[in-house]
């Protein structure tokens, strides 16, 4: 293999509520199809995040209790390394609750979890139905209009601040 993708999965034992590990399996398979090596390293509470040692950082979603534990560790122990990694060109893929933790805060009931503040957004769980289903957005990538398809399953509502959405 001529290339390799070095991936760090943050808290995979806790942030895997809807089998988010499937995203990593899909990424590994797509790399193999293209003859690109794939290295996966799990980073959890007692582990150090080394900014120059990864090409992609991935964080999935977890139960509220698990997200609270991870949020504290991210903010108190890993924020600076995460910011340094992204500033140095490392990609960051966050889904579900992992995405919510990138914002300024995530409110669940009477509790507000601290966010990393990497995205100008706040997420609040409001009364009403969960949003569950397939979704498609339009976005411009590389100067061309593209469609991105995905699946959403969330009860929180994210309010963007001084940032633009990926698509509409």
Regions found by a protein language model. Name each.
Residues 1-87:
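N-terminal beta1-alpha1 cap of cysteine-dependent amidohydrolase-like domains
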Residues 2-5, 124-168:
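Amide-donor transfer/coupling interface in amidating biosynthetic enzymes
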Residues 10-12, 43-45, 60-62, 95-98, ...:
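Fold-independent oxyanion-binding glycine-rich loops
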Residues 18, 51, 68, 103, ...:
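Generic domain-boundary/flexible-linker signal
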Residues 27-36, 105-109, 160-166:
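Short charge-dense sequence patches
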Residues 64-141, 145:
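Cysteine-nucleophile active-site neighborhood
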């Amino acid at each position: 293999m001529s290339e390799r993708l070095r991936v760090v999965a943050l808290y995979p034992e806790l942030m895997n509520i809807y089998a988010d590990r499937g995203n990593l399996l899909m990424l590994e398979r797509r790399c193999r199809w293209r003859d690109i090596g794939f290295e996966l390293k799990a980073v959890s509470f007692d582990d150090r995040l080394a900014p120059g040692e990864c090409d992609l950082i991935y964080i999935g979603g977890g139960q509220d209790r698990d997200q609270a534990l991870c949020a504290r560790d991210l903010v108190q122990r890993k924020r600076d390394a995460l910011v340094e990694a992204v500033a140095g060109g490392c990609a960051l893929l966050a889904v579900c609750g992992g995405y919510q933790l990138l914002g300024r805060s995530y409110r669940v009931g009477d509790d507000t979890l601290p966010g990393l503040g990497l995205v100008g957004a706040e997420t609040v769980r409001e009364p009403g139905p969960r949003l569950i289903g397939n979704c498609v957005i339009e976005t411009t990538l590389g100067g061309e209009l593209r469609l991105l398809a995905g699946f959403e399953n969330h009860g929180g509502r994210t309010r963007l601040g001084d940032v633009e959405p990926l698509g509409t």
